[in-house]
Amino acid sequence: MNLPNRLTVMRAVAVPFFVALMLIPVNGVACEGWCKWTALAVFIIAALTDLLDGKIARRYQLITNFGKFMDPLADKLLVCSALICLVELERIPAWVVIVIIAREFVISGIRLVAADDGVVIAASKWGKFKTVFQMIMVGFMIGNLPVFDILTQILMWIALALTLISMVDYIVKNINVFKKL
């Protein structure tokens, strides 16, 4: 397994540890004190592996079908688990998370149908923008510092817009997948 794929797997493996840190109560409150900052550190490190795996894979021609498939899946695991934890902590509206996760199911469905035909659909430019904004938004929501409340809300709306734009982009670019159904 090459280095970019190892980084992708490392990101996926970090998810259960991250979720545990998000939900461990400290003095009766989840995601506070050392747990909050450790969860944020784990999330940032995991998010940085997303940046690194792609850069390394492109620079050294280490792009694989495994990476094309698993990289977006590891992103989904990390971001969706974080969003679900944030709903539990009442830091993000549930409807926003439902829209984001619904988009992930739609795109995953398109990828699975395409994979059945031997086609691997890599992440799009809009999908990458969406992931970056979602990860930044999640980081601010984990930190939960009142001074960033307005910025966090702006990031949420941008991430939501990019979620919908990227979904439409994937559907339009892969309309041929639907024609085979």
Regions inferred by a protein language model and the residue ranges of each:
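Alpha-helical transmembrane bundles and membrane-interface segments of multipass inner-membrane proteins
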Residues: 1-181
